[in-house]
Amino acid sequence: MVSQEQYQGDIQQAEEKILLFLRTFEDIQENMHFGRIPEAQARLRDTIGDFFESAPSTLTILEPPEDLKEFHSAFSAALAHLNNSSTGFLEGVPGPNFGGAFVNSRFSLCRGLNVLYNQRAHLPTLRSYWLLPEAESTRDALEPQTDGVGVPVGMIHHPQTPEHADYSLYVPEYYTPDKTWPLIICLHGGYGRGDDYIWTWLRPAKSKGYLLLSPKSLGPTWSVLQPPVDSRSIRAMFDEVCETYSVDSSRVYLSGLSDGGTYAYLLGLDQAELFVGIAPIAGELSPAADGMLRQKQGIDVPIHVVHGVHDFIFPVEAVRSSNELLEHIGYQVKYTELPDWSHALTYSINETHVLPWFESLEPKAQA
């Protein structure tokens, strides 16, 4: 059996490879252009080399100290998930069916992230991945050693019930009920999941003290044609969270990606009393909103629309037109058009565009 120092040294080497993989793959996913898949695959392949092929045999040979056997098993499982993710992406055939390979790769990645996050106490090299750079100096304060608040904290996954779909919730590890906490509701894209999209928001939430509620749609995507179907589900989740945690009702925000952005318009205008602001990203203003627009429903809620010039799902010309319509009616619209972005995930977009805008808004006046 190797010494604990030797064992941790070998694990640290693996961590360094994993950190490089995670950062590279994140950048690829956020800047994905489906016309340039081979280039993205080549970049990822160059980054990881044969790490995932060799790591399992290395871990098998590496016998952990007794007190790290449970960690060793979890770490091995995380590597398997990351390997599945990498393999699925690299072996996906560019073309119309690549989207399915990408989604499955993403789900495997997030399963791996979940395991790594739960084992972060043993993985110091990876700790920087979970935080914004400016929060590094306060890292220890963001990870208290004791849990005395009486409610679950960290990354929590709730199953479906008759009242709501399944959802993922992040509660900062330093949560205390002695104060109220702002909440961001973030809606995944079509064929996505809550336990997938929540990871794009983890760094700012953990670093700055936000609760995250990331719902799963009841169907493969959001009920845009029948908005009440998913809105009832989301409201039930929201009420459940508010019953358990000390939520600042004057600072509840809504954002969504792609179909989630489309649904953010509908949910945000329909339940405007809940939200300080709504931020649809790479979505469209659906005709299902026509009735609400005619009645100027939710007209006092600021909207920040974020869209890429090269979006191939929802063309930017249509988004520009819908922004003009909203402004003509009297809605408060801020528009950020990203000249180099297409239609992809939103890590840095959440961190550099959406959250700063949320934080610029005045808290909602309480009745």
Each PLM stretch: what is its role?
Residues 175-223, 287, 312:
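Short substrate-entry loop that stabilizes the transition state in hydrolases
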Residues 195-203, 284-296, 317, 321:
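Alpha-helical scaffolding within the catalytic cores
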Residues 217-219, 283, 338-340:
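Active-site loop/turn elements of alpha/beta-hydrolase fold enzymes
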Residues 173-179, 223-258:
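Gly/Ser-rich "nucleophile elbow"/oxyanion-hole loop immediately N-terminal to the catalytic nucleophile
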Residues 1-180, 366:
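A domain-start/cap signature at the N-terminus of enzymes
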Residues 306, 316-367:
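C-terminal catalytic histidine-bearing segment of alpha/beta-hydrolase fold enzymes
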Residues 242-243, 250-299:
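Primarily recognizes the serine-hydrolase "nucleophile elbow" in alpha/beta-hydrolase
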Residues 299, 304-307, 311:
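Short beta-strand/loop motif that positions the catalytic acidic residue
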